[in-house]
Amino acid sequence: MRKRNISLKSKIEIQKIFKEGKLIRFSNLNLKMFYKSNHLVYSRILVTFSKGFRGSVKRNRIRRLFKEAFRKRLELLEGIALDIIFVVSYGKLTLTYFSIESLMKGLVLRCERGIGESK
């Protein structure tokens, strides 16, 4: 799969996910996840930050870590097409690659169950 297929970019689709998508909150990590099934064959991801999150270096590093963890866990989403938005709020973040990867695995499985129940 091409790298550009992983990113969610359309403003209309992003607004639709925020309005109609399901929400999972992680208050201990200052993280929210919105997800919704899509009409495509593959899943897409967007990592965004709250307004108070300063420092472009830190933001971009976290964004890269999320995208890489998602890319590696993509095989768990075989047959399920999701649009996923992560909203990272400012706080005492100690997000390492391994914590994000384990979080991603749990979230993907949780989304899979949520989509399965709604069918």
Swiss-Prot record:
It holds the Pfam family Ribonuclease_P. It comes from the Bacteria. One of its GO terms (cellular component) is ribonuclease P complex. GO terms for molecular function: 3'-tRNA processing endoribonuclease activity; ribonuclease P activity; tRNA binding. It is an enzyme of class 3 (hydrolase). InterPro entries: Ribosomal_Su5_D2-typ_SF, Ribsml_uS5_D2-typ_fold_subgr, RNase_P. Keywords: Endonuclease, Hydrolase, Nuclease, RNA-binding, tRNA processing. One of its GO terms (biological process) is tRNA 5'-leader removal. RNaseP catalyzes the removal of the 5'-leader sequence from pre-tRNA to produce the mature 5'-terminus. It can also cleave other RNA substrates such as 4.5S RNA. The protein component plays an auxiliary but essential role in vivo by binding to the 5'-leader sequence and broadening the substrate specificity of the ribozyme. Consists of a catalytic RNA component (M1 or rnpB) and a protein subunit. NCBIfam families: rnpA. Belongs to the RnpA family. This is Ribonuclease P protein component.
